Amino acid sequence: YVEPHLLRVKQYDMKFEQVAGNPITVVQFSDTHVGDFFTTEDLKKVVDKINEQQADLVLFTGDLMDNAAEYDGSIDEIATILSKIKATNGKYAVFGNRDYGGGAERFYEDLMESAGFEVLVNSSRTLEVKGTTISLFGADDALIGYYNSNKTMQGISNDHLNLLLIHEPDLISDFLSYPIDLATAGHSHGGQVYIPFYGPLLTTALAEDYVRG
């Protein structure tokens, strides 16, 4: 009831040999679970915070709504809010389990595309960002979707900066043989309830080994 409304930005400065020299800003957000406890007004605050980062790329790693079957708000309003996110070189997303459940599968991809996101479903996209060749690999949800790690990674190159989008973090074990430079995930909610120096009190399926990062 409290933590979803505590909006913080974690910044990580990383160096990769593939980067041509100009810094690249990538913003990831995930698990907004729009519904009774996280409203569209809360989502607007997330969008404002994202835009403050002046991102080159924005990545969403799934679970847009909490329960699509019970949501009585406007789907179009969510799309309109997400469309306000600015990214110089594009916005990309993958499915989470909540984006399949409750009937969300019927509209999630269309909603995200109308908001300017490209949804990656066991697929990839290669683009040039500030002189650096970046390949984005997006795996489908593994709990309810049609997850296929081998299909996702087709065509990967050691010469590119390779970014992976997955929803469930424990799936990373399926990608260890690939030259992934950065993996992004959601689903764990930081351990649901996390006690400092002790660890998570609650975990969820496919988010037990990698709870936070």
Cite the ranges covered by each PLM segment:
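N-terminal membrane-anchoring alpha-helices
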Residues: 1-18
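Membrane-embedded segments
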Residues: 5, 20-118
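Active-site metal-binding loops of divalent metal-dependent hydrolases
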Residues: 30-34, 62-64, 97-98, 123-124, ...
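Short beta-strand/loop segments at the ligand-binding rim of alpha/beta enzyme cores
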Residues: 152-164
